């Protein structure tokens, strides 16, 4: 690792030295002056693009290749392109380095990718940065020189945090999470031997091993794994180691009162990874109690996860990152390895506190990964009661829908585990769609049991759910399939009031079916994070129609409008409505009322039959009520009719034609008379010729004429060579005999060729 980074730094320095003088043979002269940079800018002969040297290209290619080697490995593993290969090439050759492993099994992939940044810093710098943060440390831990494993374990959280933060998210495959959580739970139950290998080597100093690390070949960059011949041998060695190294719970409890730095909120603190018991503290050896049904699950898990060779993160990052500052004890226990191993001393294991809300952690994708996937969620232990905070949505419970009892738990729960679960606690059922695996997958920590249950029953993929943080101390309920951060606390209080007023519904869907969305509820199916569809149970327009039919005097339109045509629309526009949108909405409402309540179109002409047909669904108790409604409809109609323009206004606006046929005939006759008078007053052609207005005859004279060429004669264009020779001969004769020339200048007379 150091060798690789030294190469990169050396190439950076050579890039800087060679890139400056790549194009020129000689370096530019150094001029000391205030305006010396202006001479460098305004040199047009220097403005051509310089060729980049071969070394520069090779160096940049090597750098790009090395950078690209680091990044996409975890994404390729997630997509199934790469398979995880065991790194046992470098395990035996460099066994002196404390391996960054846990029980000889693998890390999740993201830590392996981020180890490339770990070894860049010097040991003094890393210890200076890490140690003052986690304040109380044991004396023997502080006295000895930090080993290489401590250095790497300390730098692991920060380096991987920076590296993953640059990539904009951390997506780890669910199989890696399963392996990590399963083996993590088993390790802590067996005595906290997360980094016992590292702490057992106090004699290895960092300074002498620097040179040895620099000369390591490339395959040894990855961390080495200790190999055991079989699973049972490794398990026995872990159990023997775990009796000596137990984390001190008092030291953990004191350190919790110190504020955690925000930079490392994703990863566990350093003392949680590499802590050793203080001398004199009581460290009881814990022997794991195995259930008879458990070893098959655990052995299948161990064999599956020991075959993969990636380095394993030692502490569950979601469980240990955020602890309440009020001195609540933090645990290192995770979920048991498929409920197989149960701690012998439950008093030594304080329960896991639920994490704080999401704004403490910098990377919500890790939290979302824990709550996603096809794993069965079975809580390990109930969390201590926290002060109630209104973050869980209120669902309407069916009185018949009793919470699940302990007897209805999955069969993988042993009797001891069932005894630990309180009576009122309700376990969420596993998701229905994915097929059951061959071995029971391990469960994540207690803090994430609030799972989106109906995730697998949707036909389209849901986005990554936001994590649900903790339950209130009341008995938990089935969470609805939605995010809980979608609305504020005030809306939840309103929803509580609505839920108290409404009676419970007649039927609730079973937890394994798709949830039914009730009317007026804020529950929604999340298709995309940017688009939330809030379905209503009934048509909202139909509900409004029913309300308006039952309370006609409260509606704004004074009952349904029975008759309305285009002219009344025009009158509404003439009356200058408050806005076009309001008039359009009003028009649509009245049209919907009319169409939904009227069975046939010919009733449009008869308002009384319309009134009967519209209110046929309602029972009239008395004739007075019927008359009142009829008069109300009549007043609405007369009001609408009184708003119409008169016939005179329509005639003035050329909309309505006059209905009198005699007037129309008289108008036509008047037009004809005017036209005939104009035509009768027109003068004849003879009068116009006599008055010299018309100067042409009414006939055409035809004469015969010969064709001729109107173009001018150009005889020089038609000369033959004989004509040209005759012209030259005549010209020469004229010059020689007839042209008067001075005798002295006759020699200069120019003659043409014959």
Curated annotation (Swiss-Prot):
Main location, first listed in the record: cytoplasm
Protein name listed in UniProt: Phosphatase and actin regulator 4B
Lineage: Eukaryota, Metazoa, Chordata, Craniata, Vertebrata
Function text: Regulator of protein phosphatase 1 (PP1) required for neural tube and optic fissure closure, and enteric neural crest cell (ENCCs) migration during development. Acts as an activator of PP1. During neural tube closure, localizes to the ventral neural tube and activates PP1, leading to down-regulate cell proliferation within cranial neural tissue and the neural retina. Also acts as a regulator of migration of enteric neural crest cells (ENCCs) by activating PP1, leading to repression of the integrin signaling through the rho/rock pathway.
Bias kind Acidic residues: ranges: 483-503, 541-557, 566-576
Residue ranges of RPEL repeats: 61-86, 635-660, 673-698
Cellular localization per UniProt: Cytoplasm; Cell projection, Lamellipodium
GO terms, molecular function: actin binding; protein phosphatase 1 binding; protein phosphatase activator activity
One of the record's GO cellular component terms: lamellipodium
Leader sequence segment: none
Compositional bias annotation for Pro residues: 348-357, 381-390, 427-445, 460-478
Disordered: region residues: 1-38, 83-105, 120-625, 637-666
GO BP field: actin cytoskeleton organization; closure of optic fissure; enteric nervous system development; negative regulation of integrin-mediated signaling pathway; neural crest cell migration; neural tube closure; positive regulation of catalytic activity; regulation of cell cycle
Keyword terms, alphabetized: Actin-binding, Cell projection, Cytoplasm, Developmental protein, Neurogenesis, Phosphoprotein, Repeat
Gene that encodes it: phactr4b
Stored InterPro entries: RPEL_repeat (IPR004018)
Protein family per UniProt: Belongs to the phosphatase and actin regulator family.
Database matches in Pfam families: RPEL (PF02755)
Modified positions (Phosphoserine) in chain numbering: 642
Compositional bias ranges of the Low complexity kind: 296-307, 316-333
Quaternary structure annotation from Swiss-Prot or TrEMBL: Binds ppp1ca and actin.
Bias (Basic and acidic residues) ranges: 1-12, 138-153, 184-221, 229-241, 605-615
């Amino acid at each position: 690792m150091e060798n690789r980074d030294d190469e990169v730094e050396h190439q950076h320095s050579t890039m800087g030295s060679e890139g400056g003088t790549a194009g020129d043979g000689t370096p530019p002269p150094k001029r000391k002056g205030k305006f010396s940079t202006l001479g460098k800018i305004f040199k047009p002969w220097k403005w051509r693009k310089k060729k980049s040297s071969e070394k520069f290209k090779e160096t940049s290619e090597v750098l790009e290749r090395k950078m690209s080697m680091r990044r996409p490995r975890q994404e390729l593993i997630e997509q199934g392109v790469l398979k995880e290969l065991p790194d046992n090439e470098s395990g035996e050759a460099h066994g002196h380095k404390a391996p960054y492993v846990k029980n000889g099994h693998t890390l999740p992939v993201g830590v392996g990718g981020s180890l490339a940044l770990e070894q860049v810093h010097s040991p003094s710098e890393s210890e200076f940065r890490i140690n003052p943060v986690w304040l109380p440390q044991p004396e023997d831990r502080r006295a000895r020189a930090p080993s290489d494993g401590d250095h790497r374990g300390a730098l692991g959280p920060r380096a991987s945090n920076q590296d993953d933060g640059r990539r904009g998210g951390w997506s780890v495959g669910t199989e890696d999470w399963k392996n990590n959580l399963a083996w993590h739970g088993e390790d802590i139950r067996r005595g906290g031997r997360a980094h016992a290998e590292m702490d057992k080597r106090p004699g290895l100093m960092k300074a002498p091993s620097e040179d040895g690390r620099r000369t390591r070949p490339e395959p040894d960059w990855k961390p080495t794994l200790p190999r055991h011949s079989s699973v049972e041998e490794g398990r026995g060695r872990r159990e023997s180691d775990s009796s000596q190294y137990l984390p001190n719970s008092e030291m953990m409890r004191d350190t919790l009162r110190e504020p955690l730095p925000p930079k490392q909120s994703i990863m566990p603190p350093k003392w949680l990874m590499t802590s050793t018991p203080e001398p004199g503290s009581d460290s009881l050896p814990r022997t794991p109690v195995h259930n008879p049904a458990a070893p098959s699950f655990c052995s299948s898990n161990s064999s599956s996860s020991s075959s993969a060779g990636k380095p394993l993160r030692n502490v569950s990052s979601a469980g240990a990152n955020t602890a309440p500052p009020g001195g609540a004890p933090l645990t290192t226990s995770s979920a048991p390895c498929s409920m197989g191993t149960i701690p012998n001393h439950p008093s030594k294991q304080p329960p896991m506190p639920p994490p704080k809300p999401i704004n403490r952690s910098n990377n919500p994708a890790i939290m979302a990964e824990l709550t996603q996937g096809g794993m069965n969620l079975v809580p390990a232990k109930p969390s201590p009661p926290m002060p109630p905070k209104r973050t869980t949505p209120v669902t309407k419970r069916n009185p018949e829908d009793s919470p699940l009892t302990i007897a209805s738990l999955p069969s993988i729960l042993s009797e001891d585990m069932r005894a630990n679960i309180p009576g009122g606690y309700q376990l969420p059922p596993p998701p229905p769609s994915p097929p059951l695996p061959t071995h029971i997958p391990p469960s994540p920590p207690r803090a994430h049991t609030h799972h989106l249950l109906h995730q697998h029953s949707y036909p389209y993929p849901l986005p990554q759910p936001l994590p649900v943080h903790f339950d209130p101390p009341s008995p938990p309920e089935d969470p609805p399939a939605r995010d809980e951060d979608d609305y504020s606390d005030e809306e939840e209080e309103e929803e509580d009031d609505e839920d108290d007023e409404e009676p419970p519904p007649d039927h609730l869907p079973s937890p394994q079916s798709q949830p039914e969305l009730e009317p007026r509820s804020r529950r929604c199916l999340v298709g995309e994070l940017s688009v939330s569809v809030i379905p209503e149970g009934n048509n909202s327009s139909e509900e409004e129609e029913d309300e308006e039919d039952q309370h006609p005097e409260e509606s704004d339109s004074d009952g349904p409008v029975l008759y309305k045509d285009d002219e009344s629309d025009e009158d509404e526009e003439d009356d200058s409505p408050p806005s076009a949108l309001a008039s359009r909405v009003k028009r649509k409402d009245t049209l919907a009322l009319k169409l939904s309540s009227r069975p046939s179109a010919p009733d449009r002409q008869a308002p009384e039959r319309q009134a009967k047909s519209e209110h046929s669904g309602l029972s009239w108790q008395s004739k007075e009520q019927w008359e009142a409604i009829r008069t109300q409809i009549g007043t609405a109609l007369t009001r609408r009719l009184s708003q119409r323009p008169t016939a005179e206004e329509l005639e003035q606006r050329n909309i309505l034609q006059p209905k009198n046929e005699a007037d129309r005939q008289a108008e036509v006759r008047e037009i004809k008379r005017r036209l005939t008078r104009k035509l009768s007053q027109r003068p004849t052609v003879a009068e116009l010729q006599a008055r010299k207005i018309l100067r042409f005859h009414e006939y055409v004279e035809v004469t015969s004429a010969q064709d001729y060429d109107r173009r001018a004669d150009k005889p020089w264009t038609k000369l033959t060579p004989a004509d040209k020779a005759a012209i030259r001969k005549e010209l020469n004769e004229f010059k020689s005999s007839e042209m008067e020339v001075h005798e002295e200048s006759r020699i200069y007379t120019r003659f043409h060729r014959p």
